[in-house]
């Protein structure tokens, strides 16, 4: 078994403050013996509005954020999965990206951009149009090799599409990560149900680092970072209401993945519906 660390954050509009928190959590995770740490969506910042998001994405502090996290991965000898905003080739558009950083040289070995964007209007809740600022990703990437096993990348709203989880499992994933920033309303109704469902669909561990708490006067996130095993059991959940930033841990056992897949083989009828 191998120890995984999952971070919960309450990111603000200050990239450097968020960076300091991330570096401290990397240090804490490594000190506990974790081999890999996972951070939520928008670890670098959560902006007040679209204009600020574009401005911050192109600010030099964003480059420093990634550079310093890479250095921390090397310093503490730990794999890091972190989500950031990145400039795109289209003016006034950004990419919502999940980066895997290896600890030997601090190299980025995988860069996934969110495929499904969050464009919703919630009655008595927020209206969010991610497509106003963000380009959707155009690829599902092969799972990344880590000390925990092969980890497939998805981000937040991707969780509502079981086809992506099944695709990642078919590409060899033992684990799927869903770094997220769910709204309080959708989180309370759907968060745990979706995480457990994707674990059952794919027969993978599901790792779900989350943003939690009030970010600014317009935005708050649900929190409740979780780790779910391939049987659909929640084996760790962030519940420290006294601290908006912190860690949860769990030992991941790939033998359990094999056991679940052997015990309940999912023999698909691809003569009746398309192969994913």
From Swiss-Prot:
Q: Name the CDD domains for this protein.
A: nit
Name of the protein in its database record: Probable hydrolase nit2
Annotated Gene Ontology cellular component terms? cytosol; nucleus
Main localisation: cytoplasm
Named from the GO MF annotations, one term is: hydrolase activity, acting on carbon-nitrogen (but not peptide) bonds, in linear amides
Q: Which domain of life is it from?
A: Eukaryota
Name where it's found.
Cytoplasm; Nucleus
Domain (CN hydrolase) ranges: 1-254
Q: What Gene Ontology terms for biological process does this UniProt record contain? A: diadenosine triphosphate catabolic process
Residues of the active site = 41, 114, 156
Record keywords, A-Z: Cytoplasm, Hydrolase, Nucleus
Entry EC no(s): 3.5.-.-
Q: Which organism is it from?
A: Schizosaccharomyces pombe (strain 972 / ATCC 24843)
| One Pfam family recorded for the sequence | CN_hydrolase
| Top-rank EC class of the record's enzyme | hydrolase
Q: Which family does it belong to?
A: Belongs to the carbon-nitrogen hydrolase superfamily. NIT1/NIT2 family.
